[in-house]
């Protein structure tokens, strides 16, 4: 998914129909901050592909929406999107974690 597709989805969730150059530049900055938080790669332009992982792109989209709610001052929506982002972030970052049972060996008994 490209940065532009993520931006469009975030704006659609907030009901914002127009985008401009200042908004695009802010979106690149926000996407890179969120992607870094999720251990992803950065983009230089909105036309760059961020990831092909659907869960990762959804988490970035929710995070971008969360950041835009701060910008427009919508605290009720910000609470919702912050909670949603934190849940998606936790799921995404814990996806590779496994817990193994190990018994002590040798002299460590």
At which residue positions do the language-model features occur?
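Charged, low-complexity interaction regions
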Residues: 18, 71-77
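Conserved short "hinge" loops at termini or chain/domain junctions
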Residues: 1-52, 83, 87-109
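Short, well-ordered coil↔helix boundary/capping segments
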Residues: 51-59, 75
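Short, hydrophobic/amphipathic alpha-helical patches that form generic packing surfaces
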Residues: 58-72
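Catalytic-loop motifs flanking and including active-site residues across diverse enzymes
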Residues: 3-6, 57-61
